[in-house]
Design a protein with these regions (language model features):
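A structured beta-alpha segment of the ubiquitous adenosine-cofactor-binding alpha/beta core
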Residues: 61-80
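Beta-strand-loop-alpha-helix segment that lines the small-molecule cofactor/substrate pocket
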Residues: 82, 88-140, 155
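Conserved small/polar residues in nucleotide/adenosyl-binding loops
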Residues: 167-172
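N-terminal Rossmann-like dinucleotide-binding module
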Residues: 1-55
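Oxidoreductase and adenylate-handling cofactor-binding alpha/beta cores
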Residues: 141-164
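Nucleotide donor/acceptor-binding cores
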Residues: 3-5, 131, 161
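Hydrophobic alpha-helical segments, chiefly the membrane-spanning helices
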Residues: 179-185
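Conserved acidic residues
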Residues: 35, 58, 81
Length: 185
């Protein structure tokens, strides 16, 4: 197997569902190694969470700027290569932009940004810097979805004529507001 991609995470600490999903998904195929990140706006909480994950405390940062500054001082073979952005929606753009401008590949939770113009700007930076920028669609990583995909590909369930999907959530009506996001902010 080739060397694992060194991963950092912004947000997604504690009992954050999206944080759990990203950590599990990144470990499913043994392609990523979580190196560090910023898991909570309160550094002490972030440090404690990093300790629970078995991370070196020197790689659990107080904020994005300190992470970028510290990681960029490291030898290229040791620094974080890609960062998952799991923060409240309104922070996706400024954080992803800063990461791209500092030569980190980005894996961003939905929504990519809160405006079309921001999305175009990120796309242009990504192209100029020749970096990878991915927006997650986490259902593709679920074991049941993978099994269903294999069953369809192998003809186990016959020809598919129609697919109906239902996504249930206990999220409040205001959970889709772009100025919110993150249930503890």
């Amino acid at each position: 197997m080739s060397e694992k991609i060194r991963l950092g995470i912004l947000g997604g600490g504690g009992d954050s569902l999206i944080g759990v999903l990203h950590r599990v998904a990144s470990s499913m195929h043994d392609k990523y190694k979580l190196i560090g990140g910023v898991f909570n706006p309160e550094h002490a909480i972030s440090l404690d969470f990093g300790k629970q994950l078995g991370l070196d405390s020197s790689r659990v940062y107080k904020d994005l700027d300190s992470m970028i500054e510290s990681e960029n001082k490291l030898d290229k073979k040791d620094r974080i290569q890609a960062v998952s952005v799991l923060t409240p929606n309104f922070l996706h753009f400024p954080m992803a932009k800063s990461l791209l401008e500092n030569d980190f590949h980005v894996i961003c939770e939905k929504p990519l940004t809160t405006t079309y113009d921001e999305a175009i700007e990120l796309s242009q930076i990504k192209k100029t810097k020749k970096l990878v920028f991915a927006v997650t669609y986490t259902y593709t990583g679920y074991p049941m979805v993978r099994q269903m995909t294999d069953m369809v590909k192998n003809g186990v369930i016959g020809k598919i004529h129609k697919v109906c999907l239902l996504y249930t959530s206990d999220a409040a009506d205001d959970s889709l507001r772009v100025d919110l996001g993150g249930r503890r902010i």
